[in-house]
């Protein structure tokens, strides 16, 4: 049968967006993308998943998300199982420095040698062309969908 998931119900997937001061790299990303965010994570049942420069690539870990450094958007429409499966399948992927430069800075196609944070989150959410999303674009998209989705039918 079908289940109806309504906004405001307990969420198992969230998008966490880093707005803290961070490093010079964080500030450069925010400046280049004209966004308040320099990094993003998908939070699936309390574990943060992303591709991280600090951790060398795709990983999952439990970490604090203090409100002064992170904004969090509930994603009631997200398929937690598909997102988890994407991160499980890409757990050994390296951080995508080359793709970050090619796609985000130069607007070129990815070379497939690594994954950057917003690309990982967008791909895990099943969005088309995940390399086109920086943290700010992903935040805008997810916030829009969250505000305009009253219910989702899942079979």
What residues fall within each predicted segment?
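Glycine-rich catalytic cores of cysteine/serine-nucleophile enzymes that process amide/ester linkages
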Residues: 14-77, 101-111
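Amphipathic alpha-helical interface surfaces
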Residues: 58, 79-83, 117
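A structural motif
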Residues: 76-100
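Activation targets extended, charge/polar-rich intrinsically disordered C-terminal tails
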Residues: 100-155
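Short, Lys/Arg-enriched N-terminal segments with co-localized hydrophobic residues
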Residues: 1-10
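Exposed alpha-helical structural elements
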Residues: 24-27, 82-86, 137-140
């Amino acid at each position: 049968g079908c289940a109806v998931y309504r906004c405001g119900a307990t969420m198992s997937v969230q998008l966490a967006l880093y707005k803290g001061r961070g490093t010079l790299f964080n500030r450069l990303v925010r400046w280049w993308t004209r966004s308040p965010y320099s990094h993003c994570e998908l939070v699936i049942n309390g574990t943060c998943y992303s591709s991280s420069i600090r951790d060398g690539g795709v990983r999952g870990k439990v970490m604090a998300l203090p409100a002064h450094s992170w904004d969090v958007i509930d994603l009631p429409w997200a398929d937690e199982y598909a997102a988890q499966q994407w991160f499980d399948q890409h757990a050994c992927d390296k951080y995508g420095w080359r793709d970050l430069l090619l796609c985000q800075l130069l607007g070129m196609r990815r070379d497939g040698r690594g994954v950057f944070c917003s690309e990982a989150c967008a791909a895990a959410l099943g969005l088309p062309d995940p390399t086109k999303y920086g943290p700010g674009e992903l935040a805008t998209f997810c916030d829009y969908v969250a505000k305009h989705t009253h219910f989702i039918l899942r079979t």
